[in-house]
Amino acid sequence: MATVMELKATARPKSGKGAARAERRAGRVPGVIYGDNQPPLPISVEDKELRLRILAGRFLTTVFDVVLDGKKHRVIPRDYHLDPVKDFPIHVDFLRLGAGATIRVSVPLHLKGLESAPGVKRGGTFNIVTHTVDLEAPAESIPQFIEADVSTLDIGVSLHLSDIALPNGVKSVSREDVTLVTIVPPSGFNEEQKAAAAGAAAPAAAAAPAAKAGAAKAPAAAAKAPAAPAAKKK
């Protein structure tokens, strides 16, 4: 069950740029609640509280009860906009969640076993292809993150989304099997591998002519050998 946070809000009686600027001057961030086949609901939330929620992380995967005039609206943030200069929130959108709602979310990817992977011990380096995973999940059980065990990966081996067991009711929305992480070989690794392969092949290559020479000498020796005397008749 996902943890539900509470966020207080007030209704916005007016809309438009002028009304939004007035809300910001009053220390509030304009926003809207939409979805679930209901009309949009213009709201505003306290600037300081919204900043703290965003800075806490996982804002876009956290379910909230927005309290408005004593009534709770179950929502999830879908987007927020920051001032391009001052970097503070200037607008926030919430998606209303109906009973049994299923939504698409982008969930952080956590890796474990980084230091114990054989590829790392051999000098390889992890290349994290994606830091998030796009999933479809029930609103009441959105995973806070997806954990992937990379402790068995060797150089040149990749971990894909299909290699991970997702929680019950959660599925990937990607069309392809997403590559999550690979182990990149160290500098000069390919040359070392080629040299090792060449070194292993050298004794076999040297033994081949000797074997051929031995095979050629055997018939010649047999030809030079004197013929056995014929058996005498009694």
From Swiss-Prot:
Coiled coil: none annotated. GO terms for molecular function: 5S rRNA binding; structural constituent of ribosome. The keyword tRNA processing does not apply. GO terms for biological process: translation. GO terms for cellular component: cytosolic large ribosomal subunit. Residues 1-24 are annotated as: Disordered. InterPro entries: Rbsml_bL25/Gln-tRNA_synth_N, Ribosomal_bL25/Gln-tRNA_synth, Ribosomal_bL25_b-dom, Ribosomal_bL25_C, Ribosomal_bL25_long, Ribosomal_L25_dom, Ribosomal_uL5_bac-type. SUPFAM superfamilies: Ribosomal protein L25-like (SSF50715). Transmembrane segments: none annotated. HAMAP family: Ribosomal_bL25_CTC. This is one of the proteins that binds to the 5S RNA in the ribosome where it forms part of the central protuberance. Belongs to the bacterial ribosomal protein bL25 family. CTC subfamily. NCBIfam families: bL25_bact_ctc, PRK05618.1-2. PANTHER family: RIBOSOMAL PROTEIN L25/GLN-TRNA SYNTHETASE, ANTI-CODON-BINDING DOMAIN-CONTAINING PROTEIN (PTHR33284), RIBOSOMAL PROTEIN L25_GLN-TRNA SYNTHETASE, ANTI-CODON-BINDING DOMAIN-CONTAINING PROTEIN (PTHR33284:SF1). This is Large ribosomal subunit protein bL25. The gene is rplY.
